[in-house]
A protein has these predicted regions:
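Residues immediately within or flanking Cys/His clusters that coordinate Zn2+
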Residues: 1-2, 16
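Short functional micro-motifs and their immediate structural scaffolds
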Residues: 12-13, 27
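Short Cys/His-rich micro-motifs in 6-15 aa windows
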Residues: 22-31
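Structural signature of tandem-repeat unit edges
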Residues: 32-53, 62-78, 88-101, 111-124, ...
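Short cysteine-rich clusters marking metal-coordination/redox-active sites
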Residues: 4-7, 19-22
Length: 169
């Protein structure tokens, strides 16, 4: 099960490209209108990078912007250092299947975060990416083992265990 990036409803089933609740339809970034891009990126500060977008941070109040279950838009390829840290009411995060990089402390201090699936496309995770995520008991990763590009201390100050070769449901 995955979450719709527009409405956050969990009924956005894997393998489908549209949401039955809000009529969102997943399209390649080249086919999105400026308004569709704005709507998807509304809570985030971002910049365009080769092949997609990098989330730099959260606009306004982190506690109001990211709460409960959140799906990162499908055209985001990088999450910058400290970008989503201190979002204390963030519980679940769905990372896009083409995400390449998670920066240092990107999700640090997200104390309610309990559900993360890391897609196999992620070739870099920085130091302390999930530091002080106290509710995070298990991190599911699609990779069969820790990729070379992941910092040896990516789980610094995080007691979660990693389930390798996991499948996103």
């Amino acid at each position: 099960m995955k979450f719709c990036p527009m409405c956050g409803m969990s009924q956005f089933k894997s393998g489908l490209s549209s949401c039955e609740f809000c009529d969102y339809e997943e399209k390649p970034i080249e086919k999105l209108s400026k308004q569709e891009i704005y709507d998807l990126m509304a809570p985030y500060e971002y910049e365009w990078v080769e092949g997609g977008a990098r989330i730099l941070g959260v606009k306004n109040n982190r506690d109001l912007a990211l709460r409960g279950s959140v799906a990162i838009p499908h055209f985001v390829t990088e999450i910058a250092e400290d970008a989503l840290s201190h979002c204390k009411f963030l519980a679940r995060i769905e990372l896009p299947k083409n995400l390449r990089s998670i920066g240092d402390r990107a999700f640090a201090h997200c104390r309610d975060l309990f559900d993360v699936f890391i897609p196999e496309s992620v070739s870099h995770i920085g130091k302390g990416a999930f530091a002080d995520c106290y509710d995070l008991g298990v991190i599911c990763a699609a990779a069969p083992s820790q990729p070379d590009g992941w910092d040896s201390e990516w789980l610094l100050d995080c007691s979660a265990r990693v389930e390798w070769s996991s499948i996103d449901e």
